[in-house]
Amino acid sequence: MNKIAFIYPGQGAQKAGMGKDFYAYSPLAAEIYDKASEILNIDMKALCFEENDLLDQTEYTQAAMVTTCLAMTAVLEDAGLHPDVTAGLSLGEYCAIAVAGGMITEDAIRLVRKRGIFMQNTVPKGEGAMAAVIGAETELIEKCLAPIEDVSIANYNCPGQIVITGKKLAVEQAVETLKAAGVRRCVMLNVSGPFHSPMMIPAGEALDQEMTDMQWSELKIPYVTNVTAEYVTDIHETRALLAKQVASSVRWQASMERMIADGVDIFVEIGPGKTLAGFMRKINRNAKVYTVNTVDDAQKVIEEFRQLII
């Protein structure tokens, strides 16, 4: 018996035109976009489907990504394809929790809009930075970072790809230290803040307050949290984990390894791009990964797994 995981990408995967074919194809998907436009007072179709300058601004990106990923998921689930477990990278974790049954679509969209605003406004522009470290051993990176204050690891994405985060000068110092240690590729990222660093703790605190009056539901299936790379089956843990997540390392590689060890053998990446599929090729080449970012992709996945659909 196959075990299926739905996995969701994070900020940075967004692109103009994402989800446009789903809106035209599925009334369920269209309803999610229209509902998001209504509750946020944003033209979500213009934001997601047309070239614009807002899509790459954190306060808009996060709501656009979650709306799109949940609209795509609605098409799969309407056809009867459901996951046994979910996970999402950073922002994608909100999709994972919503699909696992922990929060309704409207609340997920509303909450990530606030999250985006908090994250964008917590640290003044230019004070924080992030950099991708390519092709280096994790132990070497951790050793190089240890003596440097105000820099830490944001993402353990996969073997050979680590993202560091923190104060701009500290990240730049870390990059120079890594290069001196023989690391060939360090790329400064074009981001609006030092995400997943302790500098984001105030954003986590604001997010925690925002969740005070939210209605949570018991999880129908588990999700794997970025913070610990462990299964979450109790919704009461979720608020604290989400508040902590914005200032904590994303343990994506360990999350995928945890799922594989638990018998997950099919991963469906839902959302724009193929970032997570690329990570998985370096984590475990034997894992079967399908990407769904067009209606054609969705139809192929539904057809392939028709025998799993009850």
What are the functions of these language-model segments?
Residues 248-264:
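A short, acidic, amphipathic alpha-helical segment used as a generic capping/interface helix at domain edges
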Residues 11-13, 101-247:
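Alpha/beta catalytic cores of group-transfer enzymes, especially the acyltransferase/condensing modules
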Residues 2-140, 189, 266-296:
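FabD-like malonyl-/acyl-CoA
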Residues 23-24, 147-148, 179-181, 281-285, ...:
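Short, solvent-exposed amphipathic alpha-helical segments in soluble enzyme
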Residues 77, 179, 260-261:
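Non-catalytic positions within long, well-ordered alpha-helices that form the structural scaffold/packing
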Residues 228, 288-309:
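Short, flexible loop segments at boundaries between secondary-structure elements
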